[in-house]
């Protein structure tokens, strides 16, 4: 009897050509939409390729076989209605997913992320420390010469975000200087951090793990030095971490 263990891909990989493994319902919906759209695109590509091949071979062996045919009403209707139907089939699930991802459903906690050149600042506005102030901290990328065994180059930080699983969370994202972007591929999050503006998104992490993201908006010479690290833990471990702050 063989035991098969899943190896989850929650970090960027060299020459990666596909999505990271999903950890939220939103990301699962995005991957399903991508697969459905690719199915229709492959069908259209195959059909158009067949038609082009058929036309080339037909006209190659015949000398103007349809020289008196100026138009075909039926085929004109087909090539107009068929693409329109395909676009509608693609559009409806896309719009539904778009509105679902934009909806913030009764968040149990809020995390504020502020982008600065070139680090992140986080605030847990629902929790206070011993001084009666909200819990906040800055997160910097660990330099390559200080990395420990098992840490990832240009992805690990000194102070990661810690959050509980199976909890509706709201991320409020802004910036203090230039435009940044808070992106977490495994969570299906990518939202601009704009100075003077508060953007929000939500996440429901369904499994424990460590997730990595990066600033996805060119923000200066040290743009690549703004990684994001989220540690998703159980509720008990999260409350213990809060008590230590």
Swiss-Prot record:
Give the E.C. number(s).
Answer: 7.1.1.9
Which sequence ranges are marked TM in the entry?
A: 37-56, 77-101
Where does the chain bind Mg(2+)? Answer: 217
Q: What is its main location?
A: mitochondrion
Task: Give the molecular function GO annotations.
Answer: copper ion binding; cytochrome-c oxidase activity
Catalytic activity of the protein: 4 Fe(II)-[cytochrome c] + O2 + 8 H(+)(in) = 4 Fe(III)-[cytochrome c] + 2 H2O + 4 H(+)(out)
Q: List the disulfide bonds.
A: none
GO CC aspect terms = mitochondrial inner membrane
Which keywords does UniProt give here? Copper, Electron transport, Magnesium, Membrane, Metal-binding, Mitochondrion, Mitochondrion inner membrane, Respiratory chain, Translocase, Transmembrane, Transmembrane helix, Transport
> Where is the protein situated, by its record's location annotation?
Mitochondrion inner membrane
Which sequence ranges are listed under topological domain Mitochondrial matrix?
57-76
Give the multimer and partner information. Component of the cytochrome c oxidase (complex IV, CIV), a multisubunit enzyme composed of a catalytic core of 3 subunits and several supernumerary subunits. The complex exists as a monomer or a dimer and forms supercomplexes (SCs) in the inner mitochondrial membrane with ubiquinol-cytochrome c oxidoreductase (cytochrome b-c1 complex, complex III, CIII).
Q: What family does the entry list?
A: Belongs to the cytochrome c oxidase subunit 2 family.
Q: What is this protein called?
A: Cytochrome c oxidase subunit 2
Annotated source species? Dekkera bruxellensis (Brettanomyces custersii)
